């Protein structure tokens, strides 16, 4: 090998090395690009990840209100947990898609006969109410791909995230209230 060739190659890499070094030092000086507190999140998966049991526990811990916006509800276990919460004095509101009401199964009948407020979207603008979230006591949001159905728990690959960030909760509550005002009572 030619010693001058090696030297030139080393010299040509030096500015690149310095740039990388400065970049690393800059990142150490400013550890986060997103100031503010970190958001706490619990993440669950199905099948076999226990999403339903985590939702039931969150329902049981609620004391004031639960607002649920889901495309479909067929889980009688979740419906029963909501009715039990209602019997404890927790205000329950369910927002679902019109199509879900037309094929209402036992879960929706349990909720309806127990006096839970249920409204549907999809009539006015022919859009699906395809949200999947719930707000618990203005303190926790549950959101993800998980419909409140038997198949979501046992057969589908689904996810659910529980978030307790007040700004995130407020935004979801605001969206629920907006949709609730547009929805038709059942």
Where are these regions (language model features)?
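Boundary at the C-terminal end of the N-terminal hydrophobic targeting segment
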Residues: 35-41
